[in-house]
Regions:
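C-terminal regulatory/oligomerization modules of transcriptional regulators
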Residues: 1-6, 84-108
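A short, Lys/Arg-enriched interface patch at domain edges and termini
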Residues: 57-88
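Extended, charge-rich alpha-helical interface modules
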Residues: 12, 71, 105-108
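A generic structured-segment signal
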Residues: 28-29, 38-40, 78-86, 93
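Basic helix-turn-helix/winged-helix DNA-binding cores
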Residues: 1-64
Length: 108
């Protein structure tokens, strides 16, 4: 079920005008974030930018870091990379804990 939710979160569904409205930013802000590499929206066959729920969540974090905390975009990029790395480490830890649990059950 988690993978299904992940797939739904990654599905591109919002055009740039809708994404901008959801985030209360201008479309040029989203284009700029794409230009500097903070976000990479999916492109339709007609080359229209499409944002997923996951993209929107990332952009909400970016907006919060910039607007609420005053962090500049290079700092935001570092924070986003660190958050991604922490998420990967958490997944790895969960897999290791599951494997350990299986091994313990096998001994009993």
């Amino acid at each position: 079920m988690s993978r299904e939710m992940d797939a739904n979160e990654a599905e591109p569904r919002y055009v740039i005008s809708i994404a901008a409205r959801m985030l209360n930013v201008q479309t040029y802000t989203l284009r700029y974030y794409e230009k500097v590499g903070i976000i990479e929206p999916h492109r339709s066959k007609g080359n229209v930018r499409l944002y997923s729920d996951r993209d929107i969540a990332i952009l909400q974090r970016v907006k919060s870091l910039v607007d609420d905390m005053g962090i500049n975009l290079p700092g935001v990029e570092v924070i986003l990379r660190m958050m991604e790395h922490v998420g990967e480490l958490q997944s790895e830890l969960e897999r290791a804990q599951e494997e350990l649990h299986k091994l313990k059950r096998g001994r009993e």
